């Protein structure tokens, strides 16, 4: 029997109900006559404190609260890709078709996965086979990019006594497993999983392979590993959202889960408009075919922001369990923290720093800890990963505020966006002096093997040049560049080339929007070769003006716009020769 209580207090999204004896923590309840979805977050005697995931205006004390007996869960199965959900996995397009309203009516209940679509199920096991949790029993071609693998649910193992082939809906039985104690378990193509509970795996693997994003500053200087975590903090207008869009478009993950958590609706609209037309460079299909969107914009109820983050990570873990690589981007975790602060205030909890609750750090850590590269459950030892990239919006660009500082304690890659760079039209506006990656040592072997054996050396030299430039800039502003020694004038010029010809990247140019690893390595090698040859010329007594006037500098400036294959196979060698000839002949 479901628990039935009644409302005694309402404070914004927080509702208190009495008569709830027998209810459980984090149980989903239906609140009021309109059956609004809520979740129990505190229990005292027979009173339950509920956070409601919909607008609570108009409900009144005395209305019923009915328990569902289940925690907040998501439906996992075919039909999630290309879909667009709100924070508690309600499909927005299906709601619009059902209600005819462009806004979500209160209390509307539409299943997350379509129940009327029949999917073509192809079995990969036979009757009599022994299966355990996480094994693949069949596949569904969900989109041209992704084959949806149907897994044995967690906690089920035994012998297949029946397996079907053909077209089925997500609720129809496709297999029957007889467990060791003789119980028959029916398996459908859909599973339910509580969002706050991480999905299990066999073993966590070290993050040794870089996630290639095609953005030079992120790949070469501040690498994110597959299964890693990154934060993108930055003030307004510094390019957080465009950076996340670039990651969602070009990173070499199989599936992208994009959570718009408390940000502007226009940004989600941009994703919906752009992604169906853009091509995935690895499969040649549309980007939307590998994307799940969770739209929880700033005008939607506050409590659902927290749910949207957990909904997104659970969907990501499910695709990871199939053996896919998943990139999860959350834009922005600051809005989720603000929602926690608001609800904590309504609960009259003791505030921590800047009014955020004392458990802010542990909640952030729980979320980021669900990233990782793993060996999944199942006999075939598949590997999958979840990368989490969280945008952080510190008010006034202050990186010492609690959300940013707590996030930095947890994540291993920090891409610091700089409003000054954005104003100078330097994009991506990632500040190379503030940013860092703690994965560099782990991924060096991959880069050295797949690009060139001197990759790490080139990267470290380039970084130290940029740091040297920052030190010299103070002197230049006092006395001007002409007062510097010749060697340091060369350093300033090469640092400028690194900034403008390597770090700057045009997201709207069809060639430069994505830069493959080999091209990144060769571009860096060319600039550093110019530096070495220029230093040799300085030692021979050549004036800096002559060195800085060579024509090869124009070729270096144009190299990012040369088509990748042509550059890697032909042009890079030509530019390298030209550098050695032009600078070598100066005397």
Curated annotation (Swiss-Prot):
Alphabetized UniProt keyword annotations: ATP synthesis, ATP-binding, Cell membrane, Hydrogen ion transport, Ion transport, Membrane, Nucleotide-binding, Translocase, Transport
Main location: membrane
Principal EC category: translocase
Membrane disposition: Peripheral membrane protein
Pfam families referenced in this protein's UniProt entry, alphabetically: ATP-synt_ab, ATP-synt_ab_N, ATP-synt_ab_Xtn, ATP-synt_VA_C
Superkingdom classification of source: Archaea
Notes on activation and inhibition: ATP hydrolysis is inhibited by N',N'-dicyclohexylcarbodiimide.
Catalytic activity: ATP + H2O + 4 H(+)(in) = ADP + phosphate + 5 H(+)(out)
Sequence positions that bind ATP: 234-241
CDD domains: ATP-synt_V_A-type_alpha_C, ATP-synt_V_A-type_alpha_N, V_A-ATPase_A
pH dependence: Optimum pH is 6.0 for ATP hydrolysis.
Protein EC: 7.1.2.2
Subcellular location: Cell membrane
Temperature-dependence annotation: Optimum temperature is 80 degrees Celsius.
Membership in a protein family: Belongs to the ATPase alpha/beta chains family.
Function: Component of the A-type ATP synthase that produces ATP from ADP in the presence of a proton gradient across the membrane. The A chain is the catalytic subunit. Hydrolyzes ATP, GTP (86% of ATPase rate) and UTP (54% of ATPase rate), has very poor activity on CTP.
Comment text on domains: Purified ATP synthase is 25.9 nm long. The hydrophilic A1 domain is 9.4 X 11.5 nm, the central stalk is 8.0 X 3.9 nm and the membrane-bound A0 domain is 6.4 X 10.6 nm; the domains are connected by two stalks. ATP is synthesized or hydrolyzed by the A1 domain while ion translocation occurs via the A0 domain.
Protein name: A-type ATP synthase subunit A
Organism classification: Archaea, Methanobacteriati, Methanobacteriota, Methanomada group, Methanococci
């Amino acid at each position: 029997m479901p628990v039935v209580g009644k409302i005694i207090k309402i404070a914004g999204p927080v509702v208190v109900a009495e008569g709830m004896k027998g209810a459980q923590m984090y149980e989903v309840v239906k609140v009021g006559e309109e059956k609004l979805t809520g979740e129990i977050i505190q229990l005292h005697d027979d009173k339950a404190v509920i956070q409601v995931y919909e607008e609570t205006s108009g409900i009144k004390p005395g209305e019923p609260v009915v328990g569902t007996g289940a925690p907040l869960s998501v439906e996992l199965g075919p039909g999630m890709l290309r879909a667009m959900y709100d924070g508690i996995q309600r499909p927005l397009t299906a709601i619009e078709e059902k209600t005819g309203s462009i806004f979500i009516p209160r209390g509307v209940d539409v299943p997350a996965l379509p129940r009327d679509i029949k999917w073509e199920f192809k079995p990969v096991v036979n009757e009599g086979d022994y299966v355990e949790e996480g094994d693949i029993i069949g596949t569904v071609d969900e989109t041209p990019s992704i084959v949806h693998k149907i897994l044995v649910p967690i906690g089920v193992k035994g012998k297949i006594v029946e397996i079907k082939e053909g077209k089925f809906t997500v609720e129809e039985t496709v297999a029957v497993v007889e467990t060791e104690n003789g119980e028959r378990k029916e398996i459908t193509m859909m599973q339910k999983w509580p969002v706050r509970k991480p999905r299990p795996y066999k073993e966590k693997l070290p993050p040794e392979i870089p996630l290639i994003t095609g953005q030079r500053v992120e790949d070469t200087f501040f690498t994110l590993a597959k299964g890693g975590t990154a934060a993108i903090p930055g003030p307004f207008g510094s390019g957080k959202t465009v950076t996340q869009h670039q990651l969602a478009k070009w990173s070499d993950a199989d599936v992208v889960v994009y959570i718009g958590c408390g940000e502007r609706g226009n940004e989600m609209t941009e994703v919906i408009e752009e992604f169906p037309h853009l091509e995935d460079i690895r499969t040649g299909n549309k980007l939307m075919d590998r994307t799940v969107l969770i739209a929880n914009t700033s005008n939607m109820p506050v409590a659902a922001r927290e749910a949207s983050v957990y909904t997104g990570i659970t969907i990501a873990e499910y695709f990871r369990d199939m053996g896919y690589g998943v990139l999860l981007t959350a834009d922005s975790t600051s809005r989720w923290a603000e929602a926690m602060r608001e609800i904590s205030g309504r609960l009259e909890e003791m505030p921590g720093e800047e009014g955020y609750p004392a458990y802010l750090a542990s909640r952030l850590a729980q979320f980021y800890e669900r990233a990782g590269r793993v060996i999944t459950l199942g006999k075939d030892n598949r590997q999958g990963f979840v990368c989490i990239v969280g945008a952080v919006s510190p008010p006034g660009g202050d990186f010492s505020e609690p959300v940013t500082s707590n996030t930095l304690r947890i994540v291993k890659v920090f891409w610091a966006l700089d409003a000054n760079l954005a104003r100078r039209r330097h994009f991506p506006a990632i500040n190379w002096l503030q940013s860092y990656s703690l994965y560099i040592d782990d991924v060096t072997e991959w880069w050295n093997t797949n690009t060139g054996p001197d990759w790490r050396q080139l990267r470290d030299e380039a970084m130290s040049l940029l740091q040297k430039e920052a030190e010299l800039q103070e002197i230049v502003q006092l006395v001007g560049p002409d007062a510097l020694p010749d060697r340091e004038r060369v350093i300033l010029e090469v640092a400028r080339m690194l900034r403008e010809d390597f770090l700057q990247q045009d997201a709207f140019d069809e060639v430069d929007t994505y830069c493959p690893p080999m091209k990144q390595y060769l571009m860096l090698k060319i600039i550093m070769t110019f530096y070495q040859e220029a230093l040799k010329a300085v030692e021979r007594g050549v004036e800096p003006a002559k060195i800085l006037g060579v024509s090869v500098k124009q070729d270096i400036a144009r190299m990012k716009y040369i088509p990748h294959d042509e550059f890697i196979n032909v042009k890079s060698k030509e530019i390298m020769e030209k550098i050695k000839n032009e600078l070598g002949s100066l005397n």
